[in-house]
């Protein structure tokens, strides 16, 4: 039961819109990791996407300060990209040499779950509006994978004698990069928002939170979230 003066346990349900920024640090083609050349393109190294997901919280209101535990699951991101480039290497004596480069990439990223603990301070202003700020620490589980293949083909096109051109394959090479990880880390974030008291027990909540999930091996992941929800105090 409610203890009066705004104190008591509460539950909250939110619908959140998340902007997700995922940065992968795959081996480069130069520098200290040049012996581990990666075929991963910039598109999969620096991913910006978004998702909509539910979030539930259980907490206690001390009449100014609040503490809460929350849980959320995020949408799985996946994409694929194919590109081809043909570069002319030589063209003389009715013989033309070209280099064809094909890249096929398939990637997934899934913030499977986030279990957080937050401390929030409500500013008591006149009226029913209550701005708040807070901090959050969370245990996150992330899965990601990449499958990238780069194939090059060098071929000769001969038009000697004015006959129909004949194409000869001279050389083929193929490089691949495959990686799959399932990682758990503790990250930190900040919270801000405004609550509006519909009734003494029911509050409409609109909020923002930034969370840095920590460095997940060769991946950095952060989210910006805007949410709308309701909070009920018992």
From Swiss-Prot:
GO cellular component: cell outer membrane
Tagged with keyword DNA-binding: no
Molecular-function annotations in GO: porin activity
Keywords on record: Cell outer membrane, Membrane, Signal, Transmembrane, Transmembrane beta strand
Highest taxon of source: Bacteria
SUPFAM superfamilies from the UniProt entry: OMPA-like (SSF56925)
Signal peptide (residue range): 1
Homology family: Belongs to the opacity porin family.
Natural source organism: Neisseria gonorrhoeae
Cellular localization per UniProt: Cell outer membrane
Protein name as it appears in the record: Opacity protein opA51
Function per UniProt: Implicated in a number of adherence functions. OPA proteins are implicated in pathogenesis and are subject to phase variation.
């Amino acid at each position: 039961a409610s203890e009066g003066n705004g104190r008591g346990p509460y539950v909250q349900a939110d619908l959140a819109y998340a902007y997700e920024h995922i940065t992968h640090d795959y081996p480069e083609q130069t520098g200290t990791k040049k012996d581990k050349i990666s075929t991963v393109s910039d598109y999969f190294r620096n991913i910006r996407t978004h998702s909509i997901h539910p979030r539930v919280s259980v907490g206690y209101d001390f009449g100014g300060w609040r503490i809460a535990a929350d849980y959320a699951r995020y949408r799985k991101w996946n994409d694929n990209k194919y590109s081809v480039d043909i570069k002319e290497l030589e063209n003389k004596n009715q013989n033309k040499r070209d280099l064809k480069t094909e890249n096929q990439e398939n990637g997934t990223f899934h913030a499977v779950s986030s279990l957080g603990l937050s401390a929030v301070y409500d500013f008591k202003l006149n009226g029913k509006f209550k701005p708040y700020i807070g901090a959050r620490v969370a245990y996150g589980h992330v899965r990601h994978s990449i499958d990238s293949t780069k194939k090059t083909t060098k071929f000769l096109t001969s038009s000697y004698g004015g006959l129909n051109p004949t194409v000869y394959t001279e050389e083929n090479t193929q490089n691949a990069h495959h990686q799959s990880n399932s990682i758990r880390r503790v990250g930190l974030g900040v919270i801000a928002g405004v609550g509006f008291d519909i009734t003494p027990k029911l509050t409409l909540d609109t909020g923002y939170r930034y969370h840095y999930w920590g460095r997940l091996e060769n991946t950095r992941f952060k989210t910006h979230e805007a949410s709308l929800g309701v909070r009920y105090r018992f």
